A protein has these predicted regions:
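Glycine-centered structural positions embedded in regular secondary structure
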Residues: 1-3, 71-72
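Vicinal oxygen chelate
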Residues: 2-33, 53, 80-155
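Core segments of cupin and vicinal oxygen chelate
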Residues: 19-23, 29-74, 108, 126
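Short linear motifs in intrinsically disordered
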Residues: 46-49, 93-95, 115-118
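Solvent-exposed, flexible loop/coil residues
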Residues: 61-63, 94, 150
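Short acidic (Asp/Glu) patches
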Residues: 77
Length: 155
């Protein structure tokens, strides 16, 4: 009888999954006639922890519960160019892993890549267009930077 330790399932490496893919939602961005008043309204009426950019939501990583992750909710000025070339009223930010390989895969699949990958202390970003003309922000986060910054979060 074959030893269970010799099965492929038993011999899989314990290394982190690096498959280029979306791992969750990183942000919800939308146009607003008055972002400041909108933030204040959501804070007052719905209890969101508000800062100058919107509200940072804090949650635990399902695969690594010791890790705190973040999602940003943010109203933008109605005339913002940040959503361009999309004409839509919103933009979704997706948390991703292995952003370089993901962009390579997207290019191979004919997806429009709007800009180059940009790197900041809190992660890497790139923007793409989906098939319906929605601009999508992809973010490979470094959540520990937000944790170190402190500040109030929506939980």
């Amino acid at each position: 009888m074959k030893d269970k330790a010799d099965t492929p399932e038993q011999n899989k490496s314990a290394t982190k999954d690096t498959t280029p893919k979306v791992t969750g939602i990183g942000g919800i961005f939308f146009r607003s006639k008055n972002p400041k008043e909108t933030r204040e309204w959501y804070g007052k009426n719905l209890g969101l922890a508000i800062n100058d950019f919107g509200s940072p939501f804090e949650f635990r990583n399902a695969n690594r519960p010791e890790e705190i992750n973040y999602l940003t909710w943010s109203p933008f000025e109605e005339e913002t160019e940040y959503f361009a070339p999309s004409k839509k009223e919103f933009m979704i930010n997706y948390r991703v892993q292995n952003i370089e390989a993901l962009v390579k895969k997207l290019r191979k699949n004919g997806v429009t890549i709007v800009d180059d990958i940009e790197e900041f202390e809190y992660g890497k970003f790139v923007h793409i267009m989906d098939l319906e003309g929605n601009k999508i922000e992809l973010w490979e986060p470094i959540d520990s930077v937000f944790t170190q910054m402190g500040g109030e979060t929506t939980k």
